[in-house]
């Protein structure tokens, strides 16, 4: 079998790893498709990438596409290796030893749509991981009146457009630059950027016509060559180090792992350690599979066997016992080291992304270690406790775990980029466990917070329905409709909420002298459950006789049970209207003159 290197003469410089990310339908796959010249997208449902993959684009191909913009003799780096994150997923933090897997990223933004939820999430994660990036402002060809110039550098094709078209595109581009500023990044059109370490370059492109693609490749190669060359220095012949992109069954090979190799060499027959749950897997490489340089790992139906692979490269590793391998986990070649030492190294790297969990909280599942870390970090920021956090689909045991919590608001499962197994969905419905599943981390956080808010609101409403509310009301002059059995009088509610079936009385000194119970309330002849401050209503009061126990002009209070007063004062004050808070405070002041600890 042949050897497979990513370049003819890589020396000690590896290929820079480029992540392509952006909101669904903004053209990530189309852009990569244009770069590699294959028709990947035409074979995919809904024009959305279905699986993660990687594409190696050698320097000579970059030079071909970029034309006069790139002089290959000026570059030492062997080319570019693109990771294609799935179109229906947001960018997750694929990690390498000590940081983000990608050396540089392309953030693809539809110039007409601007920032969308997944764009904003990608920006947050790029900022958190410190990954340098450029913005590909895609779909410039959809500007009304655009005159396409296929595969041309963007400045030339821009100059060829009419004044109106240029003006419309300028407006869209500067709106995008404004959104970048709002996100905390200084950016400008790439040819105006003097220092790419301080400013993000915006490159207008069309994945459809290829316009601007030469500029994009030129900028990527230039940035990598100028700012990252030292980071590309690797020990080519050293033991391989990589990150698992995806774990999947492959006909004829069993469970395999798709890997981005970012350091060293991996050979067929090597002993490797792969991050897994509950502990790392130690296994021997049975086969190394690699498509050609310009092929896409996701779409090649057949792979060629190779003896070895050198960084940086995308490859498929076939080996026994890979069933429990985790996407996003490290893979290490043992080489001449002690296996136990490498297992310890992998465990240490897994520990770096291990998440803090407690005895009480929600259950979290995510597709990769990196995205699990990002999700739990977002939950911690929102002060949402996590009881369990693992990589993998939502399974029945996850639902069972969610049922063990004490609080209803923690009886919840959050899934990021994962499937909910049918049995798990059935169990969740039966056990009243809420499951939220999304491909946007911050959407999950917002969904959960909205769920908790709604639950707390329902609980408070239930409490309010069953609690005696404070109120003060005055019997109106000339509004006695019946003297007793029951007394029916017109009243004005001064403050608070007067409800049916509420005991009421007058204040005598520092005590309340109960007069009776409000049995009914009518507003303009219609029965109502309550009356608020400012309302004038007629009430029927069971117990007193007008003229003897109560009189016109008297001010009556709701007789608050002490337990109810305590709940209102200590737990619900902020939910009461201002006038009702005033009524409660006045009532407590009166009661505490007699007993300072009343309602405490």
Curated annotation (Swiss-Prot):
- Molecular function GO terms recorded: GTP binding; GTPase activity; translation initiation factor activity
Keyword annotations for this protein? Answer: GTP-binding, Initiation factor, Nucleotide-binding, Protein biosynthesis
- GO BP: translational initiation
Which family is it part of? Belongs to the TRAFAC class translation factor GTPase superfamily. Classic translation factor GTPase family. IF-2 subfamily.
**Annotated stretches, region: G1:** 22-29
Name the segments for region: Disordered. Answer: 140-162
Q: Where is region (G5) located?
A: 206-208
Protein name stated in the entry: Probable translation initiation factor IF-2
Positions binding GTP in this chain are 22-29, 84-88, 138-141
Q: Outline what the protein does.
A: Function in general translation initiation by promoting the binding of the formylmethionine-tRNA to ribosomes. Seems to function along with eIF-2.
Among InterPro entries, the record links this protein to: EFTu-like_2, EFTU-type, P-loop_NTPase, Small_GTP-bd, T_Tr_GTP-bd_dom, TF_aIF-2_arc, TIF_IF2, TIF_IF2_dom3
What Pfam families does UniProt report for this protein, alphabetically? GTP_EFTU (PF00009), GTP_EFTU_D2 (PF03144), GTP_EFTU_D4 (PF14578), IF-2 (PF11987)
PANTHER family, alphabetically?
EUKARYOTIC TRANSLATION INITIATION FACTOR 5B, TRANSLATION INITIATION FACTOR IF-2-RELATED
Region (G4): which ranges?
138-141
Q: Where is this region: G3?
A: 84-87
Gene3D superfamilies linked: P-loop containing nucleotide triphosphate hydrolases, Translation factors, Translation initiation factor IF- 2, domain 3
Region G2: what ranges? Answer: 47-51
Which GO cellular component does the record give, naming just one?
A: cytoplasm
tr-type G domain boundaries: 13-228
